[in-house]
Amino acid sequence: MMDAANRAGVTAFTQSDPAGLERQVGEGGAMLSGGQRQAVTIARAFLGRPPVLLMDEPTSAMDNRSEMHIKHQLAQLKPSETLILITHKTSMLDIVDRVIVMEKGSVIADGPKSQVLNDLKQGKVRAVS
């Protein structure tokens, strides 16, 4: 549990609290910030070391420091672990190998990150009509 809490950045905000990990968080995490709630959710996902992690905007409410910590942790996944990341943040693309771009429910680009990003820059990817 401590490994998951450390990896997700939960201990970064609980270590300064006298209650530590026993701190009250309120119903639905109401006493936590949005970024703290995301850190707790990520810690729960890390707990079982699942072979596939599906994360939808996992750092959307985090500050830059917390996001960098999570990016570093996700970049450390083992080759046997797969991350499926849904994001609008281009900074999160640093940790992926493959990019799939979707628009209106259709795939408009799919391939190695460098190829897809290059195609997007050159206007080779067309929007769905």
Regions found by a protein language model. Give the residues of each.
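Conserved "ABC signature" C-loop
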Residues: 1-24, 123-128
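A short, proline-enriched helix->beta-strand linker immediately N-terminal to the Walker B motif
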Residues: 47-51, 80
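Catalytic Walker B motif of ABC-type/P-loop ATPase nucleotide-binding domains
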Residues: 53-56
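Helical segment within the ABC ATPase nucleotide-binding domain
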Residues: 67-79
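Conserved catalytic loops of ABC-family nucleotide-binding domains
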Residues: 76-85, 93
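ABC ATPase "signature
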Residues: 110-111
